């Protein structure tokens, strides 16, 4: 009996120590937390902790958008994942932002990078297409069982960034929006309540920050949370190539609001946030509430 009691005591102690490991208490409290505790190196990395795969969705098999490519974690051992639909800019195709697919998916998300119905579609059309893509992803796609349909986000570049704001204004149940050097004729987004990350570029002559990104950010007075990152010395087309600063803030934003993962707030609100040489201007509503 004494031996059994001793063994039981050892097991209880071991379990207590296991639960006390970094991230364990948070994981128990937050069922949406995915992956190990993040570091600055891990959010900057070209690949995260999850192995990924991808599948092509033909435009002939869908309606409301132009098909695309789905990037997703291969393992579901940690459960389902939040998802984000991504739209390219004016005259561009999914290939222009394809680098975001495996980079974000490997951090624990299902990423659907879409083609638009036509490459000339305007922001409002792109917003509608982003929502159609999310609907397809969660109801008809072959990876729908991997997706938590309550944890969805939108992202886009240029007119796709404008489409991101259009989509989040139309569907306030979205968990997050990430607009990359966004362009839109609409300047007032005061009714948009979705937590929004706006990424502008200092030398953008297509969508100058003074008439696009900054007014967009300032008008988001109803958004529960918002952050503005301006890329130092960058042009409108910075999101078309792998960019560590864009990835760092986009991943952290999605983790914070799609996964409710406060472990990533340090990269948005910590002492080093916005102080990188690659950032020219940084504005935020920190501390953040997800």
Model region roles, listed by residue range:
Residues 95-115:
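Short amphipathic alpha-helix adjacent to the substrate-entry channel of hydrolases
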Residues 207-218:
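Short alpha-helix in the alpha/beta-hydrolase fold that links the catalytic acid
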Residues 232-233, 240-290:
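Alpha/beta-hydrolase-fold serine-hydrolase catalytic core, especially in secreted/extracellular enzymes
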């Amino acid at each position: 009996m004494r031996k059994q009691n001793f063994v039981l005591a050892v097991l209880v102690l071991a379990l207590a120590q296991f639960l006390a490991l970094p991230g364990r208490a948070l994981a128990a409290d937050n069922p949406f937390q995915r992956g190990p505790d993040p570091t600055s190196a891990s959010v900057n990395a070209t690949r995260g902790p999850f192995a990924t795969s991808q599948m092509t969705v033909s435009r002939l098999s869908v309606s409301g958008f132009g098909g695309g490519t789905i990037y997703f974690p291969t393992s579901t051992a940690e459960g389902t994942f939040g998802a984000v639909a991504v739209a390219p800019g004016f005259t561009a195709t999914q290939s222009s932002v394809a680098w975001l697919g495996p980079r974000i998916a490997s951090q624990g998300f299902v990423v659907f990078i879409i083609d638009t119905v036509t490459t000339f579609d305007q922001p409002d059309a792109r917003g509608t297409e982003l929502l159609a893509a999310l609907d397809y992803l969660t109801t008809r796609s072959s990876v729908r069982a991997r997706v938590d349909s309550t944890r969805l986000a939108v992202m886009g570049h240029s007119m796709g960034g404008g489409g991101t704001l259009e989509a989040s204004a139309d569907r306030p149940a979205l968990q997050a929006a990430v607009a990359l050097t966004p362009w839109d004729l609409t300047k007032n987004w005061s009714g948009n309540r979705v937590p929004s990350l706006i990424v502008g570029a200092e030398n953008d002559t297509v969508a100058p920050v003074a008439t696009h990104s900054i007014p967009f950010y300032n008008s988001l007075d109803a958004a529960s949370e918002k952050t503005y990152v301006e890329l130092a010395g960058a042009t409108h087309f910075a999101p078309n190539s792998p960019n560590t600063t864009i990835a760092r803030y986009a991943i952290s934003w999605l983790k914070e609001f799609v996964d409710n993962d406060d472990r990533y707030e340090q990269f948005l609100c910590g002492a080093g946030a916005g102080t990188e040489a690659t950032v020219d201007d940084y504005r935020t509503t920190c501390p953040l509430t997800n």
